[in-house]
Amino acid sequence: MALIERIGKALEPLMLVMGLISPLATMPQLYKLYVSHSEHALGLSLTTWLLYSFIALLWTIYGIYHKNPTIWVGNCLGFLMYVAMVVGIIAHTGGTY
């Protein structure tokens, strides 16, 4: 087994954890949007969060197709977080781009 294959195999469990942690970085944005009820939504780009959602959805589908939880688990969680951002932006701003 080549060195890169051994490294990749060893990183697999860590990358699954990172895939779960990474989308959680959206939590402060969601908190500001839904809980603190600040004017924060006015500074957010609906287009950006729609693109994040679309990209995460594609990665989720790709990961499911390849039966690779390292790809689909984190991206599925990210997709849900990003959709929550999209809904919040639309609800609080009427959908500014």
UniProtKB/Swiss-Prot annotation:
The homodimer mediates transmembrane sugar transport down a concentration gradient. Transport is probably effected by rocking-type movements, where a cargo-binding cavity opens first on one and then on the other side of the membrane. Keywords: Cell membrane, Membrane, Sugar transport, Transmembrane, Transmembrane helix, Transport. The keyword Membrane applies. This is Sugar transporter SemiSWEET. One of its GO terms (cellular component) is plasma membrane. GO terms for molecular function: identical protein binding. It is found in: Cell membrane. Its main location: membrane. It is a multi-pass membrane protein. Residues 4-70 form the PQ-loop domain. Homodimer. The chain crosses the membrane at residues 15-35, 44-65, 71-91. It comes from the Bacteria.
